[in-house]
């Protein structure tokens, strides 16, 4: 089964957003440059 580039790109972006959202508090604690 071949996944289309659009779907793969969407999942990649969604995964990146999820990881960034989960890591954001750690990043702000490490680098308090608000």
Swiss-Prot record:
Name of the protein in its database record: Uncharacterized protein TP_0224
Species whose genome carries this gene: Treponema pallidum (strain Nichols)
């Amino acid at each position: 089964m071949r996944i289309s580039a659009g779907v793969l790109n969407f999942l990649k972006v969604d995964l990146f957003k999820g990881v960034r959202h989960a890591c954001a508090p750690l990043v702000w604690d490490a680098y308090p440059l608000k």
